[in-house]
């Protein structure tokens, strides 16, 4: 269990051929209940360059300290930004954008859920995946008609009577699996918890920039109101009014 000492936060946001290390505000949203993560790069008044970005240009947002940056978002620009217009923000979506744009139209014979999902990912040009190793019966026939790859995964879940989560994290597709967690971070009152409040049936913990916390991970809390290990349901990192990144962890 590790308590991170957090000083000198840094940011780096890349979209297409542009890299921003200042003059931008960020918002990054990642939740168990949403199958895709999204982010926004907003330009502050100093930055008024004309942007030329195309939908599906690659995008990465990194946060960190003392020169060590971690990916907090990987994905793509979610729309076209024409050089002739002043855009004050760029919207990004993770790899699920490619799945939403991939159409599946086929009848599948003698298949398992994992075989189908691997095929849908390949059709979207994606190969990094971690799929449940549980054994499911093969299905004699499953017709999928003009559905996006996301709808097709939902059709697979329904066909086998499964309610299992699927999402991308760090560019890897997970189906009924969780991203590996190398260490459990500790959040302690007076050390790295800026605020802890109960809102809408969940706890919201405000801390400084914490790019290493992902949804479905466990964290350890030392606080009079809550203590022990909890599982993270949502992580939102954004620039506050003073220009500092704050991470909000929900559980």
Q: Which residues does each predicted region cover?
A:
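Surface-exposed cap/loop segments at beta↔alpha junctions
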Residues: 44-127
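LysM (lysin motif) carbohydrate-binding repeats in extracellular/periplasmic proteins that recognize
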Residues: 127, 163, 226
